[in-house]
Amino acid sequence: MVNIVTLEDGTKYAVDVAFGGDGATRPLLLESDHITRNIGTQDVRLIHDTIPEHTTDQKLWMYQCRNSPELPWNSFYCFTEQEFLHSDFVVMSLFASKTIFQTTNVLAIKFLRNQEQVYGKIMLVNDVVKMNTSGKTKVERVFDTEEERVDGLNKYFGITLTQEEKEGIKGMHAELGGIGAGVSG
């Protein structure tokens, strides 16, 4: 699901604020094959087409990304223009599905800006911090302990955890060096 914003003139934009690393850094015009520059040499677009899992007459909007014009497009997710209500979200609560990627991994992303332009991003997936600038990704740091990761959240993302928040990961699947022993991302 994404938010679809309709302007007074009828123009629609898809706004996805939660996808993560290869997500769009700005609203995308809801127009098939409209290419938007994202970060560095990375392009993103939406296409309105069928997917192999559906019948041929059912079209979905697909979010695609490529890291440079000469590379192929990668499809990441798809969505419809179906409207969802509060009651729909209640039954789709994360508490009903505790095994999805976002509840079993520690994730953070920060877009790097100079004035108004996004030129890169820094990402944390479990115990690994990666930096992506100019379409190239490199590992910045690998954490061995939960204490190191907590310090890294502050250093790389400006996130300071309270003592209660630090205690909250103990014994969980994503805990580093503990019972949960998270897996590298």
Residue ranges and their predicted role:
Residues 1-141:
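His-Asp-centered catalytic microenvironments across diverse enzyme cores
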Residues 106, 115-185:
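Extended, charged low-complexity segments
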